[in-house]
Design a protein with these regions (language model features):
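Selective transmembrane helix interface/packing segments
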Residues: 1-243
Length: 243
């Protein structure tokens, strides 16, 4: 690729999003960018893993071995991660939290494959934040009475004195923005750093930055995935109240 999909081995410093090709849609010019290509690659990796895992579990043995061990370990760890913050409501959120965890994690660590991480594009992280925001307030309106919601919006003052209402409204609206910006900024900073290193070191960079890839892509990527999911579960649990 000429621009931006592959970061490693580049002679020029390039961490921008580029158009790969364009087409006309009802008279409007639409670009397919490096982000779209990288998202497609990430999705194909996840779908491929899911197909193999599904076939493996269809032939599952009572005593797990081989790839079945890997699949069961992943599921158990994801379920355990959801259990603590979500409590008795955890089974309802296994699929959602597990899905966004895997999608974000694979996107974050795709830099190990030389790709530009899709989560380094705010157009990817913002929908994830909005989706969580909608799920938070769906649970809030489902499990809390209007009176409880109003009291929460007026907190810490009594409900008949809504001085804090504007500030609490802003804090609610800021949830998807803060979630998405935190993930986007951390992943983008790692992408920029690696692009600068490759651009400045040139040929030497083919082997030396491997340790930095482990930090920026693997360690930092896993941490940001965990933080996003934990904040999501905390917000949802708070919205559900004692349900």
């Amino acid at each position: 690729m000429e621009h931006g999909i592959l970061l490693s081995g580049a002679d020029n410093i390039d961490f921008m999003i580029h158009g790969v090709f364009k087409y006309s849609f009802f008279g409007h010019e639409v670009w397919i960018t490096t982000t779209h290509v990288c998202v497609l690659i990430v999705m194909l990796i996840i779908i491929g893993f899911a197909i193999v895992a599904n076939r493996c579990m269809a032939k599952a043995r009572e005593v797990p071995e081989g790839f079945q061990n890997v699949v069961e370990l992943i599921v158990e760890k994801l379920d355990a991660m959801v259990d603590t913050p979500m409590g008795k409501a955890a089974p309802k959120f296994y699929n959602y939290i597990g899905t966004i965890f895997i999608v974000i994690l694979v996107s974050n660590i795709s830099g190990l494959l030389g790709l530009r991480p899709p989560t380094a594009d705010y157009g990817v992280t913002l929908p994830l934040g909005v989706l969580t925001f909608l799920l938070i307030h769906y649970n809030q309106f489902k499990y809390q009475k209007p009176k409880e919601i109003w009291e929460g919006m007026c907190s810490p003052l009594p409900p008949w004195l809504p001085i804090w209402l504007p500030i609490n409204l802003i804090s609610e609206i800021a949830v998807p923005i803060s979630l998405s910006l935190r993930l986007f900024a951390n992943v983008l900073s790692g992408t920029v750093m690696m692009a600068l290193i490759y651009g400045l070191l040139g040929v030497i960079a083919t082997a030396w930055p491997a340790a930095l890839h482990v930090y920026f892509d693997l360690f930092s990527g896993a941490i940001q995935t965990y933080v996003f999911c934990m904040l999501t579960m905390t917000y949802i649990a708070n919205a559900r109240g004692d349900a």
